[in-house]
Structure formats: structure tokens, C-alpha cells
Regions:
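Class I Rossmann-like S-adenosyl-L-methionine
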Residues: 1-218
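SAM-dependent Rossmann-like transferase core, predominantly class I methyltransferases
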Residues: 210-242
């Protein structure tokens, strides 16, 4: 599937070039001409691997003979991508995740690497209910140990885990209507006409929760400046500042 190739390309760029994931993913989605559904899957895969990399590596260390750092980097990228689908994406059949990863191994590495990928991921399918789970919060939620220690000094263990878990959730897309460019009340209908979902934010005026649109740059209302992306936390900071 094209979405997996796009996601892998973005992961490779992030690793090799230190690329900003959001920027490179948008570039690759345009390059590969993904439709709305494929673009959404590519984003889920890319961000999912990046957000859960430490936990993915914890599991892979139980499946791979030898050290992960001895693997060809692109092979490790492919293993992470395949394992993420097996563990987090219920709608993706295990067989599809494994087979696509094997094909990526053949394309980006070599037949020997493809055989390793096949064995590791099939083993993951068999063992995922019996392997060891990470006990430390840094690994479980794939956050830097130093950050976890810092947060632990500011809050109790239950709040700490809740914050780390929330930080790993897929963020909502929030659009701020531009009242100088058009009527904010018309924004939901425009986005719904383009095939997306758009509802008023529950506690931020002129803000809307949007999903199912793929790349926002495809929306006419976005290109015309009728709305722009603004995270809810950023908007709250403005309100608090008066």
C-alpha cells in the first residue's frame, strides 16, 4: 500500500536528515499523490512509530537475536513500522502488516533482511500476549528519562502516568476561523462538502474540530485563508494572557 511506503520514506528522512516529521510527511504525501484515506494512514503510521519508538524497541529486543543497533538502520525502521501495525492498528490484518514489511525489506535492503523481517514479525504475532512489558514509565510511554524525572518531581505517580499517556494520543486537528476573511459559521458546511467532519469546539469560540480531510492544504477554505491551524493549548494561552 502506498501509505506504508510514504510513511517509511518519512521515517527514513527523519532518521537520516533530522527532518521535521510534519513537514517531511506533508511533502511526501504530495509527492506520492496519496488520496485522503491513504494520507491519513501514512500520518498515523509515521507519527505512531515516532511516538512509541522506545516501547517498540523494547519489544523488538525480545524478538531479534543480537543487538538492535547492529541491524541495518532501514531494516530497523521497517521492523518498527510493521510491529506498530501489529500492536496498535486493529483494522490492519497481521498478515498484511507482515507481508508489506517483507516487500519493503526486499526493496530497501536485501532478500536476507527480508527473511529476518518476516521471521521477527511473525514471531511478534505469536508472542505478543506473552512477552515482557516495560515497567518504567519512560520506556512504556517512549519519553526521555530526564523529562519523566522532571515531571515526577512536579506531580504524583497517577497524574504523571496520565500526562504521559495523554501526550502519546493522536492530537485533534483544531481550526481557528478567520473572521476577517469570511463568516465562521459557514466553515463547517464548507469542510463537510469536501468530505470531512467539522464540529464546533466545545469550549473555544470560532474553533472547530476537524477530521477525515487528509492534508489541510487540499481544502479550498484553508488555501483561501478562511481558517488556520491553532492548537487548543495555544489558544488557551492567548486567552489566559488576556
Amino acid at each position: 500500500m502506498a501509505a506504508r511506503q510514504t510513511a517509511l520514506g518519512a521515517l527514513i528522512a527523519c532518521r537520516k536528515q533530522g527532518a521535521w516529521s510534519d513537514g517531511v510527511l506533508k511533502e511526501y504525501v504530495r509527492r506520492d499523490q496519496l488520496d485522503r484515506r491513504e494520507a491519513a494512514l501514512a500520518a498515523r503510521l509515521c507519527y505512531g512509530v515516532l511516538q512509541n519508538r522506545m516501547r517498540l524497541d523494547f519489544y523488538l529486543e525480545q524478538l531479534v537475536k543480537g543487538r538492535l543497533r547492529d541491524l541495518q538502520p532501514v531494516v530497523l525502521d521497517i521492523l518498527r513500522l510493521g510491529l506498530y501495525q501489529i500492536l496498535w492498528l486493529e483494522k490492519v490484518p497481521d498478515s498484511a502488516a507482515v507481508n508489506e514489511a517483507v516487500e519493503q525489506g526486499k526493496k530497501y535492503a536485501n532478500p536476507k533482511a527480508a527473511a529476518l523481517i518476516n521471521g521477527v514479525l511473525r514471531n511478534a504475532v505469536r508472542r505478543r500476549m506473552t512477552w515482557r512489558e516495560p515497567q518504567d514509565l519512560a520506556t512504556r510511554y517512549s519519553h526521555p528519562q530526564a523529562l519523566v524525572r522532571l515531571l515526577a518531581g512536579e506531580m504524583g505517580p497517577e497524574d504523571l502516568e496520565a500526562v504521559l499517556a495523554a501526550d502519546n494520543q493522536a492530537p485533534e486537528t483544531v481550526l481557528q476561523a478567520n473572521p476577517l476573511a469570511g463568516d465562521p459559521a459557514e466553515l463547517p458546511a464548507e469542510i463537510q462538502a469536501a468530505g470531512g467532519s467539522c464540529t464546533a469546539h466545545p469550549w473555544l469560540e470560532r474553533c472547530f474540530l476537524v477530521s477525515g480531510v487528509g492534508s489541510l492544504e487540499r481544502l479550498e477554505v484553508f488555501r483561501q485563508g478562511l481558517c488556520y491551524v491553532q492548537d487548543a493549548a495555544s489558544r488557551l494561552a492567548v486567552r489566559c494572557a488576556g
